[in-house]
Amino acid sequence: EFRMGTDSQALTAEDLRAINISKALAADAVEKAGSGHPGTAISLAGVAYLLYQYEMTHDPADARWLGRDRLILSSGHASLLLYIQLVLAGYGLEISDLEQLRQWGARTPGHPEFGHTPGVETTTGPLGAGFTNAVGMAMAARFEHGLLDPAAPAGGSVFDHYVYTIMGDGCLQE
């Protein structure tokens, strides 16, 4: 039995099914595209699913909501990991978008592009770029809290969101 969180909540059969479907979608999308990087999307499917379904505070109906938590995929070549979770979380991406992975004009390009795909927080691709963006976002939120909402207690401000980052060894080596 797989357990998560400090309260040791067990994953449901539905959670495990969604994670397994995420893995299958990753393999299928790369096969259809004829290129891509399925490894990270398969190996981290559970982590990304848990972040979007249980850990992160976000609103797919308002992808730019100021108080949302952010997930930065520094390993931009693994964009499929992010796209699959955006489908499952209801950000307006569909399976048909996954079928267009890495195709010209698709909403699912080979690397995440800010402003192109709903739910993508920053453009990544060059190794280390997402990591530095995430640090900057976290520092900006702390600064904005102090400047724009100084009376709010810790955890009580729209600026008290989290910035999560998925990165690989290449990002750390840069």
Regions found by a protein language model. Name each.
Residues D15, S35-A41:
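Flexible, glycine/charged-enriched surface loops at secondary-structure junctions
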Residues S43-E174:
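Cofactor-binding active-site loop characterized by glycine-rich and histidine/acidic residues
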Residues I21-S35:
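N-terminal capping segment at the start of a domain
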Residues Q9:
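A domain-level signal for the structural core that forms small-molecule/cofactor-binding pockets
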Residues T12-A18:
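N-terminal accessory segments
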Residues E1-R3:
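Short, Lys/Arg-enriched N-terminal segments with co-localized hydrophobic residues
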